[in-house]
């Protein structure tokens, strides 16, 4: 099984009734890839980060078997950032801050080596970007 994940690799600041973080690695594509790494060995990532994104976090993805050749690093720019506060039920939350940064102009490029993906998982991107990804694939994945 092969998976192509296209979505956000980001920084998050999260507050819950049980604790608070200031700046941690987040993003839909990050956790799609990490979760999938327990079930398949062919995971391809397409996303974008700024030069502020830690290289050790990219290595962590690679150590989980994630192919990061499709991860764009925009020098001189900042990584997408989201901050939220979860309520007592841990199901509802308020967004406190969203900084699109590199995500605002993200134009996904699907490497040729990713074209044979069996499954496609799209993260929380605008529909036009999601559609572009689907249309750029030679074969329609599941």
Where are these regions (language model features)?
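Extreme N-terminal starter segment of soluble prokaryotic enzymes
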Residues: 1-4
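Active-site metal-binding loops of divalent metal-dependent hydrolases
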Residues: 8-9
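Conserved N-terminal subdomain of the carbohydrate kinase-like
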Residues: 12-23, 40-122, 136-139
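Short catalytic helix/loop segments, enriched in acidic residues and glycine
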Residues: 19-34
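A short, N-terminal amphipathic alpha-helix
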Residues: 30-44
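Short, well-ordered alpha-helical microsegments
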Residues: 54-55, 128-131
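Short, structured patches in soluble enzyme cores that scaffold and shape functional sites
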Residues: 124-126
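ADP-ribose/adenylate-binding Rossmann-like module
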Residues: 142
